[in-house]
Regions:
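Hydrophobic alpha-helical segments and helix pairs
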Residues: 88-150
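Fe(II)/2-oxoglutarate oxygenase catalytic core
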Residues: 27-32, 47, 55, 65, ...
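A short glycine-rich, His/Asp/Glu-containing loop-to-beta-strand
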Residues: 13-47, 54, 148-197
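Short beta-strand His + acidic residue motifs that chelate non-heme Fe in jelly-roll/DSBH
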Residues: 46-49, 66-67, 93-95, 100-108, ...
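Glycine- and acidic-residue-biased ligand/ion/polar-headgroup-sensing regions
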Residues: 51-77, 181, 194-197
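Short acidic-glycine-tyrosine-enriched beta hairpin
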Residues: 68-98
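Long, compositionally biased, intrinsically disordered regions
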Residues: 2-7, 17
Length: 197
């Protein structure tokens, strides 16, 4: 089994998301989570439907306009402001199952690049009350930053998903980890692929 997955080999789904890793890629051994990439040119629209999945979209670089119907009617926001992942904290969109929204590449941004993470919500795996359909915008001021590890595995973690806890995400843990040059991300090497109560 190769752990090398090339984004260019991914299939494009109906929402225009390039699937990089998902449960249908049996060689990866994934059961619940999918990872993909979405890129929009300025002015290019894309309607996203979460279906039965919960979803987090992290703006890697550029800006997008988002439109959705909330509890009080039509909602609109501009998400993203950094040119790349090394230029500050991210913006993110967290959406619960049954949600629908439209993203449009912002006219001020020639291109917006996004990482898309999807999972079956926790209530489909265990008995757990699900979130109502909806969209939560996470702006950089909401993202907690912490240091983890020490010595050669010291890293900075920007925790995106805790800002949306209870508002759309029940299973996904989403964030960005920045390691000083030469450092490891964690020690000892490990993984988190089993549900524990």
């Amino acid at each position: 089994m190769s752990l090398l997955v090339k984004a260019g080999n991914g299939r494009i789904d109906n929402d225009g998301i390039v699937n990089v890793a998902n449960p249908s890629m049996t060689e990866l051994g994934l059961k619940h989570i999918s990872f993909g990439l979405l890129s929009l040119q300025g002015g290019e629209p894309r309607t996203i439907r979460t279906g039965s999945m919960e979803m987090a979209i992290v703006i890697l670089g550029g800006k997008a306009d988002i439109m959705w119907t909330g509890k009080n009617g039509e909602c609109r926001a501009i998400v993203g402001e950094r040119p790349d992942v090394f230029s500050g904290k991210a913006w993110a969109i967290c959406a619960s199952p049954g949600s629908e929204f439209t993203l449009v590449g912002n006219a001020d941004s020639p291109r917006v690049e996004m990482a898309v993470v999807r999972s079956l919500p926790l209530e489909q795996a265990k008995s757990f009350p699900g979130a109502a359909p909806g969209v939560t915008i996470v702006d950089p001021s909401m993202i907690g930053v912490r240091q983890a590890g020490r010595d050669c595995y010291l890293r900075t973690i920007n925790d995106i998903s805790s800002a949306a806890e209870g508002r759309g995400l029940t299973r996904l843990i989403v964030g960005e980890t920045f390691n000083p040059a030469g450092n490891w991300s964690s020690y000892p090497p490990h993984k988190h692929d089993q549900f524990t109560e």
